[in-house]
């Protein structure tokens, strides 16, 4: 176990450019920060989230929200596929229940998925699939909203989870999408 302060992480401060593995590149604008894989895993632990050790973190400097990027090499995904929203929600609930087992082992609070904040929809302008899940922190009953995005690429999808205060969700999504203009798959993944 390690004890690390969030300020001790190796933050990359904008304006700069960075990579998300070998699949994508991102421009970090002024006022934003980025963490590579090693420090992103530490950040996830500090935020009491289970790290995959494949994620990257992008956020405004004040950390009023943060986005977790992780590539999933599922192959090409059609943007016109019919979505079974009930099946997606059940899969998310099962994943949360499995995650709660690990959270309990670590002495962290658990969470429960309440339902959709909004159902999956395709954003043609930004070539991404998006939805938002409303969850409850089981310890203090506070609401949590995870805005999830799938940016479609040639050999898979970039999974992005935006973690934000429910009261700030709309402004956080707008800020995130505005900053996302600096994201692009590398050649061969577009």
Stretches with model-predicted labels:
Residues 33-35, 68, 159-161:
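Soluble periplasmic/extracytoplasmic beta-strand elements of cell-envelope proteins
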Residues 34, 41-42, 166:
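Short, surface-exposed beta-strand-loop junctions and turns on beta-sheet-rich folds
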Residues 14-27, 167-178:
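Short aromatic-glycine motifs in intrinsically disordered, low-complexity regions
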Residues 30-36, 182-183:
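Short conserved aromatic/hydrophobic patches within beta-strands of well-structured domains
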Residues 135-190:
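Extracytoplasmic/lumenal ectodomains and periplasmic regions of secretory and membrane proteins
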Residues 4-17, 21, 25, 39-146, ...:
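Conserved polar/disulfide-associated segments of primarily extracytoplasmic proteins
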Residues 22, 30, 73, 164-166, ...:
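Non-catalytic surface loops within mature trypsin-like serine protease
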